[in-house]
């Protein structure tokens, strides 16, 4: 501190050493443990630089301990290779720096002399079995033996195979792929068309036209004319009273003439009905075949043509039904039909009336259903054409007819 006058206080002087004091005898001496003193047998060190803590160790015991440690290390590496057989030898530089005690070997080449992508040279550890080369085909999977206690594949599970990539890499994984089971008839690429709406309409059109053809053929098959038992008439006459023995002489000849005249009245309309139904059946079968072969995909204008034809057919069924029943009603209302009916009723037969029978009515019903089915087919064909044009512009999408 400074006094008010500004004079600095003098610093305290150190205390002077006592000249009569005697120094301590162990002042400059380092204190060593008894075993660290010169001449102590426990002061000896082992070959690895660690001090021995007991006087019973010798170099042979140290060498045996080092050998046990190396064997334990080898067992650990063998366990690692068993867990991961595709893994190569471990590159432990601090472990493989030199040969083990009691072993002789050739040192590895320096890293500078190795190629960049080449395989590593032999090391002191045993190398794992090498994998297949990139140019070699992978080995096929081995079949499982009967006595193998491995996992059994359930019967419903599809057959599978395993594929190993050809390029060996650490941690390589097995790729497992499945083969699909045998597909059904409609699962193939082309037959899938039969499950679409257009194909169902086309097959229904085929069925309806076949039924119309069958109904029309009933009237066409009756060749007409009286047939006695000795002449063995057709099945139609046996069922509807054509084969009988009630007429003889003039009545039999008159019945034969009336049958031929009535048959000639119905023949034109029945023939036209059979021809039209047969032609439509063939046309619908052609459309189904083209759909299975995917012809409309390559030529979309065929879909437009199909749609127009379906609309024309659906519209043509209406006047066809009118003319069909008009001509049939004219034939059933003719004097020939009435005289024929009276002749057969006089002999007790009632199957020759002047009215529409079941085959004529069935043909009309199937034709009416055909109008609806063909109209629906025309709509689906136009929609299919629009979708094909859209897919032609965007081929990434997929559409099945």
From Swiss-Prot:
The chain crosses the membrane at residues 227-247, 272-292, 301-321, 361-381. Residues 1-119, 145-160 have a biased composition (Basic and acidic residues). Residues 193-386 form the MARVEL domain. Residues 129-143 have a biased composition (Pro residues). It is a multi-pass membrane protein. Residues 1-226, 293-300, 382-401 are cytoplasmic. It is found in: Membrane; Cell junction, Tight junction. GO terms for biological process: bicellular tight junction assembly; cell-cell junction organization; negative regulation of epithelial cell migration; negative regulation of epithelial cell proliferation; negative regulation of JNK cascade; protein localization to cell junction; response to osmotic stress. Residues 1-173 are annotated as: Disordered. GO terms for molecular function: mitogen-activated protein kinase kinase kinase binding. The keyword Transmembrane helix applies. Residues 248-271, 322-360 are extracellular. One of its GO terms (cellular component) is cytoplasmic vesicle. Keywords: Cell junction, Membrane, Tight junction, Transmembrane, Transmembrane helix. As a component of tight junctions, plays a role in paracellular ion conductivity. This is MARVEL domain-containing protein 3. It comes from Homo sapiens.
